[in-house]
């Protein structure tokens, strides 16, 4: 009885989390194979998904994942940008192989490709966006698990989990719940105990937010200590050079001493002010042959 109450409380907590992440919000269109999972339709035309059936399908998918011995035989793939971070985190904690981004055609069918693989299970985010791997998995008899919205095609999907596969919070919440259920069934996490990994790690983050977070996490350096450090090349290094490294030819200083007898008078010095111009030098007397007076003047 206690285990049933604990399971019921866990289910209620998971459903509340899915409601907060808007997992229950579908689209205005509904595929005929998804009508069994629809709870009701709002006045604005949006279909509401029954989260009780979503939780049951998550448990079924977790049992299928645990039944595979080697986790590397499981491929988790998402071409939708909102699901790429969640796919990588899911693969990190469960040991599966993640493919985040565009699917290379022929990965499951062309044996000549270097990226060829034959997985035992394929987990996808959106059957409409990931239509190529679904078709290749059908050709290779690979079972497929996919998160299906109300308008998603169910062809070639073996286990369809009804949920909102277009919101970044919804996709992260679904992969977090699936990873926690897998770890609980493997015995890594005890039943009824809280998983220490937060669901926020599975959410999509904008590149600008990631860059700002990395800049905030950088430690602030002590620049004052760097300036107070010893100078490059201390004073002892200048005297440490031996004299043998210098050349043998020593340049003698020029003899600049001039005897006092050879000094000459310098020219006139300029005025005290900067704007005062120096007086031109007076020319010396020039010897001219002047005739002697004759008395007629």
Swiss-Prot record:
Pfam families: Ribosomal_S2. Its main location: cytoplasm. GO terms for molecular function: structural constituent of ribosome. Keywords: Cytoplasm, Ribonucleoprotein, Ribosomal protein. The keyword Transit peptide does not apply. It is found in: Cytoplasm. Coiled coil: none annotated. GO terms for cellular component: cytosolic small ribosomal subunit. HAMAP family: Ribosomal_S2_euk (MF_03015). PANTHER family: 40S RIBOSOMAL PROTEIN SA. Component of the small ribosomal subunit. Mature ribosomes consist of a small (40S) and a large (60S) subunit. The 40S subunit contains about 33 different proteins and 1 molecule of RNA (18S). The 60S subunit contains about 49 different proteins and 3 molecules of RNA (25S, 5.8S and 5S). Interacts with ribosomal protein S21. NCBIfam families: uS2_euk_arch. Belongs to the universal ribosomal protein uS2 family. This is Small ribosomal subunit protein uS2. It comes from Daucus carota. The lineage of its organism: Eukaryota, Viridiplantae, Streptophyta, Embryophyta, Tracheophyta. The gene is 179B.
């Amino acid at each position: 009885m206690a285990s049933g109450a604990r399971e019921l409380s866990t289910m209620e907590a998971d459903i509340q989390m899915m409601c907060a992440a808007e997992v229950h919000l579908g689209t205005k269109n509904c595929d005929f194979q998804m009508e069994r999972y629809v709870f009701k339709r709002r006045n604005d035309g949006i279909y509401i998904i029954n989260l009780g059936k979503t939780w049951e399908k998550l448990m079924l998918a977790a049992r299928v994942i645990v039944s595979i011995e080697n986790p590397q035989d499981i491929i988790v793939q998402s071409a939708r940008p909102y699901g790429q971070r969640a796919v990588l985190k899911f693969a990190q904690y469960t040991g599966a192989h993640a493919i985040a981004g565009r699917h290379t055609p022929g990965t499951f069918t062309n044996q000549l490709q270097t990226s060829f693989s034959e997985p035992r299970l394929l987990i996808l985010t959106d059957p409409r966006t990931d239509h190529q791997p679904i078709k290749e998995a059908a050709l290779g008899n690979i079972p497929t698990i996919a998160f299906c919205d109300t308008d998603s095609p169910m062809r070639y999907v073996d286990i369809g989990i009804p949920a909102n596969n277009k919101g970044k919070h919804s996709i992260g919440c679904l992969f977090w719940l699936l990873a926690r259920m897998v770890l609980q069934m493997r015995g890594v996490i005890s039943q009824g105990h809280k998983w220490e990994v937060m669901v926020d790690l599975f959410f999509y983050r904008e590149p600008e937010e990631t860059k700002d977070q990395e800049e905030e996490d950088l430690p602030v350096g002590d620049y004052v200590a760097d300036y107070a450090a010893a100078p490059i090349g201390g004073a002892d290094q200048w005297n440490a050079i031996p004299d043998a490294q210098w050349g043998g030819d020593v340049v003698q200083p020029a003899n600049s001493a001039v005897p006092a007898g050879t000094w000459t008078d310098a020219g006139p010095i300029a005025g005290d002010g900067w704007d005062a111009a120096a007086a031109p030098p007076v020319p010396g007397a020039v010897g001219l042959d002047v005739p002697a007076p004759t008395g007629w003047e």
